[in-house]
A protein has these predicted regions:
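N-terminal small/polar loop signature for handling phosphorylated ligands or for N-terminal nucleophile
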Residues: 1-28
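Generic hydrophobic alpha-helical segments
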Residues: 3-7, 45, 83
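Short glycine/threonine-rich catalytic loop with a Thr-x-Gly-x-Asp
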Residues: 19-20, 34-41, 108-112
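Short acidic-glycine loop/turn motifs at beta-strand connectors
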Residues: 19-20, 29-31, 178-180, 189
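Short, ordered loop/turn segments at secondary-structure junctions
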Residues: 20, 31-32, 40, 61, ...
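Short Gly/Thr/Asp-enriched flexible loops that form oxyanion-binding sites at enzyme active sites
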Residues: 24-42, 66-67
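Short, acidic/small-residue loops that bind anionic groups at enzyme active sites
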Residues: 34-51, 77
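Phosphate-binding and adjacent anionic-ligand microenvironments
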Residues: 50-218
Length: 218
């Protein structure tokens, strides 16, 4: 797109794009590639942890890349308000969501793209590395978002036997967790659908998670 091309044309170290209300940030690398909103929080947290040890608060569907950076991650229901509530409850200084939202408590308790930009620029300045180099040192995962029509009466407790996993989290729908993959299933608040989020090391693993769930719900 236009920003990707502009980064290449001017030889920029990084490109930033915010949403209209300035609470979410996307990044374009020095190679002119949009790297995905999931990296915004991960890179901001990496910078913060260079200076101060901290727990990090985020929602259930944020990438497990965060666990590779942070010593401890607290997961919440999806939604900025739930992340902020947990930050207040446990006095956690930094948090956010995988949609490009970074929350730094010392500034204010809300997602802020300018905070994210400043933290990522600080990371690049202190490390002397490019954005491309920084993300190459972070474990890579493939993510898929999907949805399926459902019966409103579906019982989430009945879904627990679909997968043989290491951990199940039921604070917001149901999430099945393994060391290097997960699938999160939750009802939409506005539509008769289940929203599905899945992440794994490769396409085959992600597809297997999604297909297993869909076949069970047929």
């Amino acid at each position: 797109n236009e920003l990707e091309q502009k980064v290449i044309n001017v030889g920029a170290d990084v490109g930033f794009a915010t949403d209209p209300d300035g609470d979410r940030l996307s990044i374009v690398s020095n190679k002119g590639n949009a790297i995905g909103e999931e990296y915004t929080l991960v890179l901001a947290v990496k910078n913060y942890l260079n200076y101060q040890k901290s727990i990090v608060a985020t929602n259930l569907s944020t990438s497990m890349m965060l666990e590779s950076i942070a010593n401890e991650t607290i997961r919440t229901k999806i939604g900025e308000a739930h992340v902020v509530q947990k930050m207040n409850e446990l006095n956690i200084p930094i948090g956010g969501e995988g949609n490009g939202g970074v929350i730094l408590k010392e500034v204010h308790l809300g997602r802020d793209s300018l905070v994210a930009i400043s933290m990522i620029l600080s990371l690049l300045s202190s490390s002397g590395k490019s954005i491309s180099d920084e993300i190459s040192n972070i474990p890579q995962y493939l993510r898929i978002k999907d949805k399926i029509l459902i019966d409103d009466k579906i019982d989430f407790d009945s879904l627990e036997t679909i997968f043989d996993c290491n951990e199940i989290n039921k604070i917001d729908g149901i999430k099945f967790i393994w060391p290097n993959k997960w699938i999160h299933i939750r009802k939409s608040n506005t539509e008769p659908i289940i929203r599905i989020f899945a992440e794994a090391k490769n396409q085959d693993e992600v597809n297997e998670l999604i297909n297993t769930l869909k076949n069970y719900l047929k």
